UniProtKB/Swiss-Prot annotation:
Family that this chain belongs to: Belongs to the peptidase S24 family.
Subunit structure, as described in the record: Homodimer.
Keyword DNA repair: yes
Swiss-Prot/TrEMBL catalytic activity: Hydrolysis of Ala-|-Gly bond in repressor LexA
Function: Represses a number of genes involved in the response to DNA damage (SOS response), including recA and lexA. In the presence of single-stranded DNA, RecA interacts with LexA causing an autocatalytic cleavage which disrupts the DNA-binding part of LexA, leading to derepression of the SOS regulon and eventually DNA repair.
Top-level taxon of origin: Bacteria
Name this protein carries in UniProt: LexA repressor
BP terms from Gene Ontology: DNA repair; DNA replication; negative regulation of DNA-templated transcription; proteolysis; SOS response
Pfam family, one: Peptidase_S24
Amino acid sequence: MTKLSKRQLDILTFIKEEVKSKGYPPSVREIGEAVGLASSSTVHGHLARLETKGLIRRDPTKPRAIEVLDEEELNIPKSAVMNVPVIGKVTAGLPITAVENVEEYFPLPETFAAPDEQVFMLEIMGESMIDAGILDKDYVIVRQQSTANNGDIVVAMTEEDEATVKRFYKEDTHFRLQPENPSMEPIILQNVSILGKVIGVFRNIH
């Protein structure tokens, strides 16, 4: 193995452990906390040296894009991660994961979905689901499906061709999309298109 300082080895080991346990790499802040470095610039310096040594690769445009290159030596299974499309907008008439809708891809553990299931992520805008623990700027992890049971949290397309995340209820004469915020009214629809069921939430802690 390329010669590393103790700090560099600690950082590389922490990245490896986070990828193996969570399926995606840690943030710079998390790395600093794990190895006892208060300065993010110092962490960036160590990451730059690891990159120079060919042990990691970074994408400076993304906060968590740290790829461990020495995977065989570090025993990181490539099959443990799937790249999930992050949807920037939902275009009526197009599949939810159409190229026109995808902003980027985010690594998640394959355990989030069965092999035959399709998963996407969507950024939450607003506070309509705060009582369900889904906050403004969170990303929901969504399993694609066109049906839902009463009480499921879903991504649905309204009659105005707008995507919304709400709790789903099918009632006698209509569908009710219920917010989880007592200050907001439900959306009542005669027709609704289900795009998927929310199965998880991802949040950046700043």
